Amino acid sequence: MYFGLSEDQIFFQDNIKKFLEENSSVDILRKIAADDRTFAKDIHDGIVNLGINGLLVPEEFGGLGLDILFAAAISESLGYGAGATPFIGSYVMAPIAIIDGGSDEQKQKYLTKIVSNEVKFGVGFSALTGARDNSEIQIKGNKISGRSLFIL
């Protein structure tokens, strides 16, 4: 039995590595950190153009409908080139949560927006104190704001 990556997975990895080699550097990452940004929009948009945003989204919603192993291969490539992008939260955790727990209406609304790059999701999973404290969460309109120890 073969346990290596498929040709398609290797192709995706190679394209992302090449893009990051050409467009990301330590100097760029330092500038992002100095500007207090979480990611570089131009680098992120370039990686999105390679198709990562629709990776796990089913084809019926405009995505590629691939599996979590594909996401792991992409994650490895992003780490190789220090790709500062909201990959895990927006393109792995959010689609999985919406697919598994969302209504048909929510799937149509949000999965298509993930694929079209209209939205980016963040996933917070621990309060600043490490304990669950809903008083730190504020809702303004349909957006949640607040602080958390870990945001992906």
Where are these regions (language model features)?
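Conserved "HGTGT" condensation-loop signature of ketosynthase/thiolase-family condensing enzymes
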Residues: 14
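Intrinsic disorder at enzyme termini
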Residues: 1-8
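Short secondary-structure junction/hinge motifs that connect adjacent elements
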Residues: 27-49
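Glycine-rich, Trp-frequent "lid" loop and neighboring beta-strands that shape
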Residues: 63-64, 105-152
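Internal helix-loop-helix
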Residues: 49-108, 112-117, 152
